[in-house]
Design a protein with these regions (language model features):
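Conserved beta-strand termini and adjacent loop/short-helix elements that scaffold enzyme active sites
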Residues: 15-17, 97, 158-161
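GT-A fold catalytic core of metal-dependent nucleotide-sugar glycosyltransferases
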Residues: 38-117
Length: 214
């Protein structure tokens, strides 16, 4: 990822969110429980406050035209594709991938507009309150918000095979279904999701060595 960012002069932030928790009201836990009352896991939802931070010059000290979230289990395999490429040929403000399960926000690309700042704020606040304890909290927040104005017509979807493909012949699903979303040499990244950590590292190393990514 660092090498890709260096090529395009991007400013990356790497954040380990795997054990983060944030104080947020939720009706789904017992407020009287001193261990969990009022606390919901950050994990996937951390992407919304982080995106919001880098969309506001008064917070981050920069005026960013675009912001991007890329899960740390994604390996960029095609350095020739800049982030701005995904905004070519359309006027949408948000770019997401889709896979067999629908919305797949392992990569989130946004123009820095008032509408998108509103979206990440809404996902961070209302989305968190509704879905903070859900295993796919970020996905559910997007599904809810993107179904309605003012956001419904501001998103452009690309296949996960193009943006964040699955490693070939790894995930246990019907082969004909899986093949629609598996990595090809034209894929931008490979997404090593829902796998044992050591297995992810092993697959990542294979891609790095085969494609000379470092």
């Amino acid at each position: 990822m660092r090498k890709y960012c260096e090529k395009w002069n991007y400013a990356p932030l790497f954040e380990d969110c795997s054990t983060r928790q944030e104080k947020k009201h939720t009706p789904w836990v017992d407020d009287k429980d001193p261990e969990i009352g009022h606390y919901v896991p950050m994990r996937t939802m951390i992407k919304f406050p982080l995106l919001e931070h880098f969309m506001r010059e008064e917070d981050c000290g920069q005026n960013n035209d675009y912001v991007a979230w890329i899960d740390n289990d994604c390996v960029v395999t095609n350095y020739s594709v800049p982030i701005t490429k995904w905004f070519d040929g359309h006027d949408k403000d948000l770019v997401l991938a889709f896979d067999v399960n629908g919305v797949h926000p392992t990569i989130i690309l946004m123009r820095n507009t008032v509408l998108m700042r509103g979206l990440v704020w809404a996902c961070k606040e209302a989305g968190w309150r509704m879905y903070g304890m859900h295993g796919w909290s970020d996905i559910m927040a997007f599904r809810f918000m993107l179904d309605y104005p003012p956001y419904a017509d501001r998103v452009k979807f690309f296949s996960a095979q193009e943006m964040c493909a699955m490693p070939p012949m790894v995930h246990p699903m019907p082969a004909d279904v899986r093949s629609q979303f598996e990595w090809t040499p034209d894929s931008w990244t490979v997404h090593l999701s829902a796998l044992d950590l050591q297995y992810r590292v092993s697959i990542a190393q294979q891609f790095v060595e085969k494609l000379g990514l470092i």
